Amino acid sequence: NLKVLAVFVLCAILVVVTAERRGTETGGYKKDTLEDLKKRTHDCFDSFKEATCHMAKTNRLCKTSAKYQINCKKTCGLC
């Protein structure tokens, strides 16, 4: 009985904490879009390793993958 109560309390805390989180880094309630992330990235650098970004550019993933568009901006020529 005590274990069930403890699990219930922990789940309730998790629900409350998750509900209080805001949807975006800027503090709004809407979800960030890819365009929002691109606009907020002012510096031109690659977050991923050089070889990873080079592979993404070689395989033309810079145009199709949001992951590489954000993390390989310099190599992909997006800034």
From Swiss-Prot:
Keywords: Disulfide bond, Ion channel impairing toxin, Nematocyst, Neurotoxin, Potassium channel impairing toxin, Secreted, Signal, Toxin, Voltage-gated potassium channel impairing toxin
Residue positions assigned to the propeptide: 20-37
Free-text function comment from the UniProt entry: Inhibits voltage-gated potassium channels (Kv1/KCNA).
Source species taxonomy: Eukaryota, Metazoa, Cnidaria, Anthozoa, Hexacorallia
ShKT domain mapped to chain residues: 44-79
Subcellular location: Secreted; Nematocyst
Main location: secreted
Signal peptide boundaries: 1-19
The protein, known as: U-actitoxin-Avd9d
Disulfide bridge positions per record: 44-79, 53-72, 62-76
Recorded family membership: Belongs to the sea anemone type 1 potassium channel toxin family. Type 1b subfamily.
Region (Crucial for binding to potassium channels): 67-68
Gene Ontology terms, MF aspect: potassium channel regulator activity; toxin activity
One GO CC term, this protein: extracellular region
